[in-house]
Structures are given as structure tokens and as C-alpha cells.
Amino acid sequence: MTNIRKTHPLLKIVNHSLIDLPAPSNISAWWNFGSLLGLCLMIQIFTGLFLAMHYTSDTTTAFSSVTHICRDVNYGWLIRYLHANGASMFFICLYMHVGRGIYYGSYTYLETWNIGIILLFAVMATAFMGYVLPWGQMSFWGATVITNLLSAIPYIGTTLVEWIWGGFSVDKATLTRFFAFHFILPFIIATLVLIHLLFLHETGSNNPTGIPSNSDKIPFHPYYTIKDTLGFLVAILLLLILVLFSPDLLGDPDNYTPANPLNTPPHIKPEWYFLFAYAILRSIPNKLGGVLALVLSILVLAFIPFLHMSKQRSMMFRPISQVLFWVLVADLLTLTWIGGQPVEHPFITIGQVASVLYFTTILILMPLASLIENKILKW
């Protein structure tokens, strides 16, 4: 008799996605981040659900409801810090996943790549709105500064900002709607993840060489289920170490002060995972230009497939491109550092140089390097 997993309409889908899926035999640990992102999403949805049971989205009680969660709810402190630091783990995995895609040429799967970019924007929007919910100083001023950027849009800007705020400033209406959006978006993300996987399974996974691996496939289970489980254990261990030993390491102390519209914090800055984009935004003295650069800092990923000039897919055998890739990584780390610094000399100049280098590397230097490598290999 045929196994039920191969005949049952629902189990059949699971079987083709997670059990009998033909996978390349040589995919490295860099391919673990996809499943880790799935784990992060599940952790965030479950911890978020339990937080939402005790949180109140009202300006007068939001801050104290978070305090109540940490002090009075059973293991509330654990749920809260798992959720806050889970977001950091989410972004670490996201950036590693995108970096892997760039390095090994996974962006040539256009549909999968484009859904991935939409997912990145959706996760960033969710994280931003989540940061506003505790209604601390950095929550309030972060929301004010970032939403205010939309006023740079010609003609409709001011109206748009007031429409998003639900008034003439960030207030009760803003907090309530941000909570509603923050709650619904992860489920939209989960749906997009399924579409992401649907498109991926149309082509099958890429591998480190970038060479088609149809002649050498192995079943996903048990090989990659075991490998992913190891990844899960390592990730959970690292997250628990962070949560249980230094839960506030990545947070901002200003967010332990309740929101006060009359008192601006000396340095308004977002969470660490947005600092690179924030640095790019600040490096342009014009408001609209800054907003465009901010959006383009992520949207530039959509141009990468069309700038792929190399005859090879992966960077595995392309030393010049490899050097440029790691220059890009170093540049992003520099931007992250600059984003957390005050707007003064020499940080302004460093930020501007790093911003120019970021776009130049992706849009000009990498395609040029590919052409040079083709020439060297007489292709």
C-alpha cells in the first residue's frame, strides 16, 4: 500500500516540500538561514500572541502594560525579551540569507528573489511598528521622525503623514493602528513565505558552485531535516544566551523612559538592524533625496539580477567579485556604526563616503568585475 504521505491531499504538499524534496547534495551551512527564518517567524508569532494578551494599545497605559508584563505576568519578562531579541535574530538571519543569495547568485531565480525583497520590506515595516508599541521615548520619537519622512513626498506628503498619524501628531490613534498592523503583518509575511517557497520549489535550490545539480540530488529528509535541526539548536542556544544574560544589550536605555512629546532625546536612532539605512538617509542633506536613498538602499537588491554580467552564476570561482562582496559587507558594517553616531565631524563625511561606496559597489563595481573576470577567462 502507498504511504499516506504520498496520497493524502494535504500531506502530499508537506511531503513534496519537506520530505521527498530533491535537494542538491552539496549545499553548505549558508543554506540553513531559510529554515532559521521560518523558526524566527514562528517564535515571533507565538511570543507576540502571548504579549498581545496582556498589552494595551492606549497611550496612557501602553508603557505600564509592558512593565506589568515584565513584573506580574508568569514568565512575562522571558516572553517579552524573547520577542525583542528574537527580532534581532530575525534580522541577523535575514541579512545572512540575502548575503548568501548575492554571493552564490541565487538572485537569478527572479520570482523567488523579488518575493524575498517584498518580504524584507514587510519584516522591516513590522519591526518598525513593533518598536513603537512599548511607548518609550525612543518609540515615540522614532515613530515621529520616520513617519515624518513621508512629508517629503511632493504635493501629497503632509496630508499623507497626517492620515497615517490619524491626527496632527503621533498620538493615541497612531499607536492603536500600529498595534493593529503589527499584529496582522506577520500573518501576511507567513503567506508570502509560502509563495516564496512555491517559487523556489519550481526551480529547486541553488548550490555553492552555481552549477545545475539535477544529476546529483538527495532527499531533503533525513539529510537536511537533521542539518536544519542542528541550526535550530544553535540559534535557540544563542538567542537564550542573549535573553538570559544581557537582554538589554541591543536595546536603547531611552526606551525605559515613558514617551514625552515635550522632551526630545539627545540622539534619536532606530534599532541596530536599521542603522545602515538610517546612515544612508542622514548622509544626504536634502529631505526627499534622503528618503529616496533610504528606499533605494533596499530596493537596489531588485537591480542585482539585471546587473549580473558574469558567465558564472556563483562567486565561488570569481576572486575579484569576492573581494568586492566583502568590501560591501565591510561598508554595511561601517554604515551600521555611523548610523549610531551623532551627526558631527568626522562621522558625517564617513557616512557620505560609505553611502556612495555602497551604491557604487552594487551598481557599478560588481558588474565591471564580472566583465573583467569574463575577459580573463576568455569568455
From Swiss-Prot:
Heme b b562 binds at residues 83, 182. Binds 2 heme b groups non-covalently. A ubiquinone binds at residue 201. Gene3D superfamilies: Cytochrome Bc1 Complex, Chain C. GO terms for molecular function: metal ion binding; ubiquinol-cytochrome-c reductase activity. SUPFAM superfamilies: a domain/subunit of cytochrome bc1 complex (Ubiquinol-cytochrome c reductase), Transmembrane di-heme cytochromes. Keywords: Electron transport, Heme, Iron, Membrane, Metal-binding, Mitochondrion, Mitochondrion inner membrane, Respiratory chain, Transmembrane, Transmembrane helix, Transport, Ubiquinone. The chain crosses the membrane at residues 33-53, 77-98, 113-133, 178-198, 226-246, 288-308, 320-340, 347-367. It comes from the Eukaryota. InterPro entries: Cyt_b/b6_C, Cyt_b/b6_C_sf, Cyt_b/b6_N, Cytb/b6-like_sf, Cytochrome_b, Cytochrome_b_C_euk/bac, Cytochrome_b_N_euk/bac, Di-haem_cyt_TM. PROSITE patterns: CYTB_CTER, CYTB_NTER. One of its GO terms (biological process) is mitochondrial electron transport, ubiquinol to cytochrome c. Its cofactor is heme b. GO terms for cellular component: mitochondrial inner membrane; respiratory chain complex III. Component of the ubiquinol-cytochrome c reductase complex (complex III or cytochrome b-c1 complex) that is part of the mitochondrial respiratory chain. The b-c1 complex mediates electron transfer from ubiquinol to cytochrome c. Contributes to the generation of a proton gradient across the mitochondrial membrane that is then used for ATP synthesis. Heme 1 (or BL or b562) is low-potential and absorbs at about 562 nm, and heme 2 (or BH or b566) is high-potential and absorbs at about 566 nm. This is Cytochrome b. It comes from Oryctolagus cuniculus. The gene is MT-CYB.
